[in-house]
């Protein structure tokens, strides 16, 4: 029939427009929030527009995995709430158009959003995470975060730089307290930071002294012309040279989980995380594409429940549903890490629970006439 087809295009257009609006707003909020964390390092290394653009591109790609489903929920809630506020849904029902005709365009759009989310989750987002480490490694190699006149902590090492000239550092002081019983203090007139092909970070110091506190009665001083000092940058870059679950390509991750969980082969030291982390990450990527479908099914009956204040109502419900969904994933993930749940149960239980809630709300909305 021509009427349902026209109606479908109308509903789809409304949802798509609000989704694009939500995607712009939510992406900007998430991007600025995460970019602020890296801004100190960016400015400390010497601001460059190429660095900012690289961070924006990589962070934007990573955050899109969550921004897209939440934006679709936002679009469904606002579009349906606006239709309800303008009494358009009542008019549709008076013309004999049921819930099925209204839901079909939303389901169709949710499948498109799910396909995009799946592509992001399987390989695009992990690749962006790997690139983010490369961006930070590049910043660190130029002395990222070592702002003259300020102390910066790298693990158990406190670093102070008196001045900077290009990529070179002047007046470097290091306090290494990785061994509290034998602290080490290093003074150097100059130095540079370098990242090798394997991602190891080395601070090349020139013309300085090493002060070793061997005993409570005696201090040892060693002078040097050049001294290479390896920094522990695990907090900034993660475990160097080891495979992290969140950064692995999907095929490698699946093979790792099969080898560990199915065949029982233990992980060697080349892997940064525990076996449960790799299994949780695998099921996180597999479950991610279901979020837009669930949000679409939830958004329709929720949006039809109220007619006034559609925009504020939709924004509040969007935040609440998204928080509940992703919060439940985090909660069950913590239970799995403690050994109380298996990884598949921890990842798929929220999906099953929200699916049951969505179908119950749809059935109730259909029964009570919206």
Task: Report each predicted region and the residues it spans.
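Short helix-to-coil transition segments within interhelical loops
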Residues: 93-98, 339
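Mechanotransmission and gating elements of multispan inner-membrane complexes involved in transport
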Residues: 196-201, 206-280
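Start (N-cap) of specific transmembrane helices in multi-pass transporter permeases
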Residues: 10, 14, 18, 101-110, ...
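Long, hydrophobic alpha-helical segments
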Residues: 25, 60-79
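Hydrophobic alpha-helical transmembrane segments
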Residues: 1-58
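Transmembrane alpha-helical segments that form the functional core of multipass membrane systems
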Residues: 43, 273-363
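Non-transmembrane, extracytosolic/lumenal segments of membrane-associated proteins
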Residues: 50, 54, 109-224
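Transmembrane helix boundary and interhelical loop/hinge segments in multi-pass membrane proteins
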Residues: 76-90, 95
